[in-house]
């Protein structure tokens, strides 16, 4: 495991133990989608129930649109779910732990703008 991977694992483990982890509905859906085996689906669903669900409001969607436009003006197209995750993180002043390359590019632009940790 690389140093970066170890750091992310430690950060995530600490955040879970401290109950600082939240997810939004679209992440829950994305993680569960495509699991064909009913038993595996139910096990993962139960595991995800341990995480607080951060409710989405009109503000989050409007903020996502604003951030999308900002990223686009910097030459980057962000996916709808990726930029929604960023909007929630900006509003909560929260960090995002991810290995998703598309989301990481969005985060880089928003960090450069001083909007994300």
Predicted segments with their positions:
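Short loop->beta-strand "edge-of-pocket" segments that line small-molecule binding or catalytic clefts
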Residues: 20-23, 49-55, 95
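Short, well-structured N-terminal submotif of metal-dependent ribonuclease cores
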Residues: 1-23, 33-46, 117
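Acidic, PIN/NYN-like endoribonuclease modules and their adjacent C-terminal/linker elements
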Residues: 11-13, 86, 90-117
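Short beta-strand scaffold positions
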Residues: 55-58, 80, 98
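Histidine- and aromatic-rich ligand-binding microenvironments
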Residues: 24, 77-79, 100, 116-117
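Acidic catalytic patch
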Residues: 50-73
